[in-house]
C-alpha cells in the first residue's frame, strides 16, 4: 500500500512516516501543497494523510484537486486546530 503524508510540522511528519513505514507501508512525505501536487501527479496513492493547514495553501483545496484526478484515493485529515 502506497501512502503520502502531507504535514508541515517536521516532527509530526517524520513520526508518521516512521511509524507507517515500520508497519510495512511505502510512504512518501511532503511539507507543502506544491510538493504534494507534484507527488500526486507522478504516482498513485492508496491513502493520503493530509494536514488541513499548510504553509502554501489549504488542505481542503488540495483534497479537491487530488480527487478530481484520482477520485478513489482515500484521504485522512489531520489538524492541530482546536474547536475554540
Q: Which role does the model predict for each range below?
A:
Residues 1-84:
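N-terminal/domain-start alpha-helical segments
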Amino acid at each position: 500500500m502506497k501512502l503520502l503524508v502531507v504535514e508541515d510540522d517536521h516532527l509530526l511528519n517524520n513520526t508518521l512516516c516512521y511509524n507507517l513505514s515500520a508497519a510495512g507501508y511505502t510512504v512518501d512525505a511532503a511539507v507543502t501543497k506544491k510538493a504534494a501536487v507534484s507527488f500526486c501527479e507522478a504516482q498513485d496513492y492508496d491513502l493520503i494523510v493530509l494536514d488541513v493547514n499548510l504553509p502554501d495553501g489549504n488542505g481542503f483545496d488540495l483534497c479537491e484537486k487530488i480527487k478530481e484526478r484520482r477520485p478513489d484515493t482515500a484521504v485522512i485529515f489531520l489538524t492541530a486546530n482546536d474547536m475554540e
